[in-house]
Amino acid sequence: MTDYFLLFVGTVLVNNFVLVKFLGLCPFMGVSKKLETAIGMGFATTFVMTLASVCSWLVNTFILLPLDLIYLRTLSFILVIAVVVQFTELVVRKTSPTLYRLLGIFLPLITTNCAVLGVALLNINQSHDFLQSAIYGFGAAAGFSLVMVLFAAIRERLAVADVPAPFKGSSIGLITAGLMSLAFMGFSGLVKF
């Protein structure tokens, strides 16, 4: 049980997908201008990453490995992710039309989010079992959501702050992301792998 907790904490804080592995930077910068949009995108991405991680593990274990089709791994994972994203889009459209409108084009773009494909491929490369895959996918998504919500809150405050003209917009956003990455480096001694 401790191993699962350490895997979760290590994935959320120590090996954060955005700030350490630099995966998922497009939605991180694109959706983080408003806090409510970042929260909605975080929930959608959490659902997709967790489900895609589990489904990819199942496809790899029960289809690709027995049939010796490992060379189709990336292509099949992309297909699995696309199906999961379409399912998520249908669920969000039916349950929360306001969130669906807020997310706009970013919801279908979760399909091309490299963090989602990254979590599926890293699960296989690290030889996780089913439960570890689910925890790793959920931890990666929770870390992604945490960083995106924190960054959105900071960006909302920076929008009304007195920032020098050359640093307004993306410049101060990248500086802030760099400082957040340095702050998360403080967690590096928390979990030993």
Swiss-Prot record:
Protein name, as recorded: Ion-translocating oxidoreductase complex subunit A
Localization (cell): Cell inner membrane
Membrane topology: Multi-pass membrane protein
EC identifiers of the protein: 7.-.-.-
Keyword Methyltransferase: no
GO biological process, one term: electron transport chain
Keyword hit for Translocase: yes
Transmembrane segments: 5-25, 39-59, 62-82, 102-122, 134-154, 171-191
Assigned keywords, A-Z: Cell inner membrane, Cell membrane, Electron transport, Membrane, Translocase, Transmembrane, Transmembrane helix, Transport
GO cellular component: plasma membrane
The protein's assembly and partners: The complex is composed of six subunits: RnfA, RnfB, RnfC, RnfD, RnfE and RnfG.
Family: Belongs to the NqrDE/RnfAE family.
